[in-house]
Amino acid sequence: MMSLAHSKFSCQRTRLLAVVLLAALWSSSLQQAAARVINDDCPNLIGNRDLYKKVEWICDDCANIYRSTGMASLCRKDCFFNEDFLWCVRATERSEDLAQLKQWVTILGAGRI
């Protein structure tokens, strides 16, 4: 016969296991969702996060300069392969870096459909 203390411990252990499993499943689904978003925008972001941050900085600066709602999103659209990004390069006075930025955008967007 099981003692009352052993029964309570077993119940607590089962609840703890259920919470841990749910947390693991939730975390896994969040990571998969984040990976899909990243892969949809910039297929080669994984392994090139430093390039992404350098290019993204242009969009952040542009949004800060003009305080325009959605400017950063427009700039990042299609993994920075758009006219808004080029406009932001000029607006942030980074035209001298345009060739390097275009190369980074090409690396980040390689494999993009």
UniProtKB/Swiss-Prot annotation:
Gene Ontology MF terms in the entry: neuropeptide hormone activity
Annotated localization: Secreted
Family, similarity comment: Belongs to the arthropod CHH/MIH/GIH/VIH hormone family.
Domain of life per record: Eukaryota
Signal peptide residues on this chain, from the entry's feature table: 1-35
Protein name stated in the entry: Molt-inhibiting hormone
Described purpose of this protein according to its UniProt entry: Inhibits Y-organs where molting hormone (ecdysteroid) is secreted. A molting cycle is initiated when MIH secretion diminishes or stops.
Disulphide-bonded residues: C42-C79, C59-C75, C62-C88
Transmembrane segments: none
Biological processes annotated in GO: circadian rhythm; neuropeptide signaling pathway
GO CC entries: extracellular region
Pfam families: Crust_neurohorm (PF01147)
InterPro entries associated with the record: Crust_neurhormone_CS, Crust_neurohorm, Crust_neurohorm_sf, Hyperglycemic, Hyperglycemic2
Assigned keywords, A-Z: Disulfide bond, Hormone, Neuropeptide, Secreted, Signal
